[in-house]
Structures are given as structure tokens and as C-alpha cells.
């Protein structure tokens, strides 16, 4: 048995890529995309027809160049999602423009638009997750969307405050980041060597997983952003793990049965009162790593969105 097969026996394996060939190879249940992955996928020759289709679509919708650009990038993200849905049995995560991360209403409207594009292509809501950054405003948007039957994946999650607020909002799924937490600790503590069990990102996801199970929250925990296979092995048993093709290939190449590391068997506890906005900011901002990584993550996704726009503009 490969380690990948062993992992699949206890955790839903998700592919963190927009590369259709990689998805075919590893046969994940679900797939996740983001602006950075859409940008790199768009450079692959097999995606050219999807880009052409997105541009043709945008031109039928508006004469305004700015609106055409917005429509083209939304349609391209959905087109890539549609191709991926042909080869996975589960859900695709498609991300809202990161530049809307602090605007609740704009996030809601963008999510509805993406869902409408999927619906028009014959895809029902139960196969889609709308990815939103885990800002206070993003979490409030997700709360509204969940009530409309639009399931959300709250990403760029680094703090306990973010995790708690997501569960309290009834969000379908969260993506707590592992590797980026490790990156911050390596850069800021001077320590470079972390065994997987002491990896701060692994510890963070483990704590969130246990908190959710302890308080009987239904929100799915999907560990994300891995730097090495050992982090993944240390989180075997997590609800879901979204993994890059490179690390999926390492797991597939290694034989052996994994030990389940995450499994809650303790007593259930009463849920606390939901966090207020001020409590959320106080707790989240008390964690300098979470503050830095959330801001950096949003900026990086926004930067790649702008690169994607530049590429589309040249074709419009």
C-alpha cells in the first residue's frame, strides 16, 4: 500500500492545483484553485481554448473594457473549474477576487456571480465551494452565502480567532494553512529545524481540529499549504487535506501504512458565545504571525490576479 492510499483511508485527499493532467494522475476527491494556481494553469497550452472562450464570453456581455476584463477573469476561473469537475467526483473550490477581502457586500455579489456561471453550465451548487479569505468581512459574507445554499471554503486561515469565527458563522469548510505558519516561525525565531510533531503549522491545525470536534462544530477542517510530506503524515486523519501534485507524487512513491494522528475521542463541551467583531480583532491581532500572513496572502493573491488581468487585457 502506498502512503497516498493509506492517507485516503482516513482523510479525504484534495488536489491543490489547476493542472488537469496532475488531477487525472492522482484522482483526488476534490480540487482547490486560487488566483496563483489559475495564473500558472493559464500558461499551459491546453488552457488556450478556455481563455479564448472566456474572452469571447466577456465581449458578448459588455462594451465597457473594464467590465469585459472582470467578466473574462470570472469566466476563466469557472472554465478551469468546469474542466476539473469533469474528472473529479467531488467539489471544486473557486476563489473570489482577493481585492474584495475587506468588502462583505462585494464578496457576496462576486460569489453569486461565480455560482451563476457554474449553474448556467449545468453544475449544481453541491459541487462548488466559493473560496473567501478569512477576514471578518469575508466570514460575514460566507455567513450570508451559506444561508443561500452557497457553501464556502474560508482560506488564508492562521489564527484560532479566525477558526472560531468561521465555525460560529456556520461556514462549510476552512483551510488552515500549515507551511506558511512554519515559514513565519523560521523567519522570525531563528530556528530552522522543526520535526513534524513540533511544526507550528501542524500544531495549529491539530488544535483547530480538536476545538471543532470538542464543540461539535460541523465545519470541515481541510489542512492546506504544505512544505513537506512529514507535515501531511502528521495530520493523517484530518477531515480533508489539500495537497500539491509534487507532494502527492512523493506520497504515491512511498510504501507503508500511515498512523492516524488526528481523531477526537474526548468529552464534548458547551460552545462559547460567538465572538463579537471587537473580540475577533483583539484575539486575531494578538497573534503577529496571523496578522502578517493574512495580509501577505491577500496581497500575493491580488498581485497574481493583476498579472492574470494583464494577460487577459493583451487578448481583449
Swiss-Prot record:
Superkingdom assignment: Bacteria
Coiled-coil stretches: none
Enzyme class per UniProt: transferase
UniProt keyword list: Cytoplasm, Pentose shunt, Schiff base, Transferase
InterPro entries membership: Aldolase_TIM, TAL/FSA, Transaldolase_1, Transaldolase_AS
Keyword Amino-acid biosynthesis: no
CDD domains on file: Transaldolase_TalAB (cd00957)
Catalytic activity annotation: D-sedoheptulose 7-phosphate + D-glyceraldehyde 3-phosphate = D-erythrose 4-phosphate + beta-D-fructose 6-phosphate
EC number: 2.2.1.2
Subcellular location: Cytoplasm
Cellular component aspect of the GO annotation: cytosol
Main location: cytoplasm
Keyword Cytoplasm: yes
GO terms of biological process kind: carbohydrate metabolic process; pentose-phosphate shunt
Similarity section: Belongs to the transaldolase family. Type 1 subfamily.
PANTHER family: TRANSALDOLASE
Protein name in the entry: Transaldolase B
Annotated organism of origin: Pasteurella multocida (strain Pm70)
Lineage of the organism: Bacteria, Pseudomonadati, Pseudomonadota, Gammaproteobacteria, Pasteurellales
Amino acid at each position: 500500500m502506498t502512503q497516498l492510499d493509506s492517507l485516503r483511508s482516513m482523510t479525504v485527499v484534495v488536489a491543490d492545483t489547476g493542472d488537469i493532467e496532475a488531477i487525472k494522475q492522482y484522482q483526488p476527491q476534490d480540487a482547490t484553485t486560487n488566483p496563483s494556481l489559475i495564473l500558472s494553469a493559464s500558461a499551459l497550452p491546453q488552457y488556450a481554448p478556455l481563455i479564448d472562450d472566456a474572452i469571447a464570453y466577456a465581449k458578448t456581455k459588455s462594451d465597457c473594457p473594464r467590465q469585459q476584463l472582470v467578466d473574462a477573469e470570472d469566466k476563466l476561473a469557472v472554465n478551469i473549474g468546469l474542466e476539473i469537475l469533469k474528472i473529479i467526483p467531488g467539489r471544486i473550490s473557486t476563489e473570489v477576487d482577493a481585492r474584495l477581502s475587506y468588502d462583505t457586500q462585494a464578496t457576496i455579489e462576486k460569489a453569486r456571480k461565480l455560482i451563476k456561471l457554474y449553474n448556467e453550465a449545468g453544475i449544481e451548487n453541491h459541487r462548488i465551494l466559493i473560496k473567501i479569505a478569512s477576514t471578518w468581512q469575508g466570514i460575514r459574507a460566507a455567513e450570508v452565502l451559506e444561508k443561500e445554499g452557497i457553501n464556502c471554503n474560508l482560506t488564508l486561515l492562521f489564527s484560532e480567532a479566525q477558526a472560531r469565527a468561521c465555525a460560529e458563522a456556520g461556514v462549510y469548510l476552512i483551510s488552515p494553512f500549515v507551511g506558511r505558519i512554519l515559514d513565519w516561525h523560521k523567519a522570525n525565531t531563528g530556528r530552522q529545524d522543526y520535526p513534524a510533531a513540533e511544526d507550528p503549522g501542524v500544531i495549529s491545525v491539530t488544535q483547530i481540529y480538536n476545538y471543532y470536534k470538542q464543540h461539535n462544530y460541523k465545519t470541515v477542517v481541510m489542512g492546506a499549504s504544505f512544505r513537506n510530506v512529514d507535515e501531511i503524515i502528521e495530520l493523517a486523519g484530518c477531515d480533508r487535506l489539500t495537497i500539491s501534485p509534487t507532494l502527492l507524487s512523493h506520497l504515491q512513491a512511498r510504501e507503508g501504512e500511515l498512523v492516524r494522528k488526528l481523531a477526537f475521542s474526548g468529552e464534548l463541551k458547551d460552545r462559547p458565545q460567538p465572538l463579537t467583531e471587537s473580540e475577533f480583532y483583539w484575539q486575531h491581532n494578538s497573534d503577529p504571525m496571523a496578522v502578517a500572513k493574512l495580509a501577505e496572502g491577500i496581497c500575493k493573491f491580488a498581485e497574481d490576479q493583476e498579472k492574470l488581468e494583464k494577460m487577459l487585457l493583451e487578448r481583449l
